[in-house]
């Protein structure tokens, strides 16, 4: 990415530790551009989202060479309180000088009830904002949390001369309050790109009897203990055109458990999952990428439907012995988009003269 020349700085904003800064009329006007209606944000690939401790130079360097769709440089749980300031500087330096390729580059800040969140945003965005694609906001319990970040980002963008609204937001839903307000959270800012399920804090919030992050409670006999929050977050995300990303599976050496976990949420419709270790990347990438045959089928449906509706004027047709119609096209669009994002190349072309494509459904 080509670096842009930053505009002059207009000074620092004050803060009250542990509280969300009150939004004044002046602040609202200053960030108005970031809240005006815009076209839907570009959807970024997020099959694998790698957590990278911001206080570890070794991990910051290693992450650059891994085959993940997104890296989020963590200033929250992975960084001890005494290391927060140094981690901000390390993250900004890694963003400026690192070779991240086509990865989505995100930074997870501390939550808005801490005394660190404000400085996380201001320091990192002022030093390396042109290299940040999104901010991950943890422990989002109300839409006001997202609004606060939107306003602050707008102020820093304006002060630094960055395009208004360029930096996106990923909101982590991590407790009962956040899940109860998830519809309002999903609508809180046009910067929002994804809702992320945070299983560890969510399990603690509900009092689940398990110490394994992302794993089913051992004595729970009702099926999938996470199905409701997963589905609730997914519906809220899709209603607002957002992506849905699952949190991590902490047992990094349990490949079978990770595969089952990832396959389940991928089948539900999630776009990706957090990974904590390089050894988890290949499994999660595979589970969130369509199989070649499924991708080919999706592209074939799209091509056949386009032909039959535009050339022959049909509303439905038969393809490989199955009826395809507008509903089929919508499903195929999803699978095809995921296959393209995963870098798949179609191996089968639609030809209307083939017998498999002939005939109107009875």
Name the predicted role of every residue range.
Residues 6-7, 28:
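Generic early N-terminus positional signal peaking at residue ~5-7
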Residues 17-362:
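Expand to "…catalyze enediolate/carbanion chemistry for C-C bond making/breaking, isomerization
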């Amino acid at each position: 990415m080509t670096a842009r020349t930053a505009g002059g700085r207009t000074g620092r904003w004050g803060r009250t530790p542990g509280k969300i800064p009150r939004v004044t009329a002046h602040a609202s006007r200053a960030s108005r551009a970031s809240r005006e209606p815009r076209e839907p944000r570009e959807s970024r690939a997020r099959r694998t989202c790698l957590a990278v401790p911001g206080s570890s130079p070794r991990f910051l360097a290693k992450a650059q060479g891994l085959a993940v769709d997104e890296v989020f440089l963590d200033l929250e749980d992975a960084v001890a309180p005494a290391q927060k300031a140094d981690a901000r500087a390390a993250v900004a330096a890694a963003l400026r000088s690192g070779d991240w390729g086509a990865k989505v580059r995100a930074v997870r800040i501390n939550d808005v009830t801490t005394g660190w969140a404000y400085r996380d945003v201001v320091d990192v965005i002022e030093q390396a904002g042109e290299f940040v694609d999104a901010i991950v906001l943890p422990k989002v319990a109300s839409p006001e949390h997202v609004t606060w970040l939107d306003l602050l980002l707008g102020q820093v963008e304006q002060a630094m001369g960055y395009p208004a609204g360029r930096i996106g937001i990923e909101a982590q839903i991590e407790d009962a309050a956040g899940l109860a307000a998830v519809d309002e959270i999903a609508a809180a800012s046009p910067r929002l790109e994804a809702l992320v399920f945070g299983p560890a804090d969510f399990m603690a919030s509900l009092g689940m009897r398990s110490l394994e992050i992302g794993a089913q409670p051992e004595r729970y006999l009702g099926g999938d203990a996470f199905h409701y929050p997963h589905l609730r977050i997914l519906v809220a995300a899709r209603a607002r055109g957002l992506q849905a990303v699952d949190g991590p599976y902490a047992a990094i050496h349990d490949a079978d458990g990770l595969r089952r976990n990832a396959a389940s949420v991928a089948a539900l419709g999630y776009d990706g999952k957090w990974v904590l270790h390089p050894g988890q990347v290949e499994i999660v990438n595979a589970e969130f990428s369509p199989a070649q045959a499924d991708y080919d089928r999706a592209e074939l449906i799209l091509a056949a439907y386009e032909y039959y509706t535009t050339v022959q004027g049909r509303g439905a047709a038969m393809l490989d012995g199955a009826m395809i119609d507008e509903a089929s096209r919508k499903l195929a669009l999803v699978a095809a988009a995921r296959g393209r994002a995963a870098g798949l190349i179609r191996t089968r072309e639609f030809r209307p003269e083939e017998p498999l494509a002939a005939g109107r459904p009875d």
